[in-house]
């Protein structure tokens, strides 16, 4: 029998359902430098990064948007669950219609220029509605499984990835209680994040959580949940969707992780792209390397990378009666 025909081109199944030409752009080197190397470097500094933020800033709405402009494209469309409000004379970034799938948190870096040139076609629909429309049009992605894995980490095994790419940063060390006593050993600081409870391997009368990563001593500091509460943080690389920082402190609802619950806070713009955020109640896992994003109702106002959590804001005996608000003890 004749040999089987060669497989169709990568995008052929999509091309059958669209009227658009496919154009490719090699950005592998840039992606490695701006996203993968950043991911590794942040873990080496004892921080917990979100690589999607770096990808959106430098790749999707950086290089890719500029490439679209070079092709004289009117817009760059992506599948993010978010909305752009163009009704008020300036562009506002709003949450997606599906609260379970909203992705506005990872888009806070978009300013007026970017929002003028992007489209989020599915942002006004729920995920269920989008799947239904895809089925009606016989699109092959209608039944595609969702994935929360890092796209550059095979099998979602980020631990093995870090051991391969930064073995010098993955060294065992002591687990200390808040008094400085060694109560166990950890497998490498990059494997832990503030607020984490699972996987510590310590038997104790009460549940213990990661309080902080002591990079200088390669030590993991743990303690009871009452030691976790923190009310303030400082963020860097701050972006304001309007393009202008507020001249006075503003009341906001803020998220400190992608799936975190919104929490009431006061946002104060500082100099040189910095901001200080003070929450009404302590949060238990404010983590350097993650983003803090400010909202007013459905509108995204600003966001930045958490740089610093003042030690003076650790919840001590005076705050034991006011429990910290947990955002989850899973790794980011």
Feature annotation, model-predicted:
Residues 32-33, 126:
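A short acidic, often aromatic-flanked loop/helix-cap motif at beta-alpha or helix-coil junctions
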Residues 15, 52-55, 151-152:
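Functionally engaged cysteine thiol sites
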Residues 77-84, 89-332:
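AMP-forming adenylation/ATP pyrophosphatase catalytic core
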Residues 16-31:
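Short, small-residue-biased leader/transition segments that mark boundaries at the very start
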Residues 19, 65, 131:
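Short glycine-/small-residue-rich flexible loop motifs, especially phosphate/cofactor-binding loops
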Residues 4-20:
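Short, well-ordered junction/capping motifs at the entry into regular secondary structure
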Residues 33-90, 163:
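Conserved adenosine/adenylate-binding substructure
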